[in-house]
Amino acid sequence: MEKFKRPFRKSKRSFRRRLPPIGLGDRIDYRNMSLISRFISEQGKILPRRVNRLTLKQQRLITIAIKQARILSLLPFLNNEKQFERAESISRTTGTRTRKK
């Protein structure tokens, strides 16, 4: 009684390569706000390279462009819009306390 061992095979899913976020015709420039705003988080921070899926050179150029736009006040340094409004504060009752002796 011999056991038949089947070789392990990986499932053949179709691998779809993601399109690069910056096309060949896109110029990385501090005035190109539609391009720059794609690489900034909601808080106004520059997104990291692994999130952006950019090359090292592209990430460097994007970072420089964002910093130039911030200095020229085209972009804010921080986005301080409050997302959550404060709920009404609970008023504490001030009454007499009884002590246990």
UniProtKB/Swiss-Prot annotation:
GO cellular component: chloroplast; mitochondrial small ribosomal subunit
Molecular function GO terms recorded: small ribosomal subunit rRNA binding; structural constituent of ribosome
Gene Ontology terms: biological process: translation
This protein's UniProt keywords: Chloroplast, Plastid, Ribonucleoprotein, Ribosomal protein, RNA-binding, rRNA-binding
InterPro entries referenced in this protein's UniProt entry, alphabetically: Ribosomal_bS18 (IPR001648), Ribosomal_bS18_CS (IPR018275), Ribosomal_bS18_sf (IPR036870)
PROSITE patterns in alphabetical order: RIBOSOMAL_S18
Gene3D superfamilies: Ribosomal protein S18
Pfam families for the chain: Ribosomal_S18
UniProt-annotated location(s): Plastid, Chloroplast
UniProt record similarity statement: Belongs to the bacterial ribosomal protein bS18 family.
HAMAP family for this protein: Ribosomal_bS18
Quaternary structure, from the entry: Part of the 30S ribosomal subunit.
PANTHER family referenced in this protein's UniProt entry, alphabetically: 30S RIBOSOMAL PROTEIN S18, SMALL RIBOSOMAL SUBUNIT PROTEIN BS18M
Name of the protein described by the UniProt record: Small ribosomal subunit protein bS18c
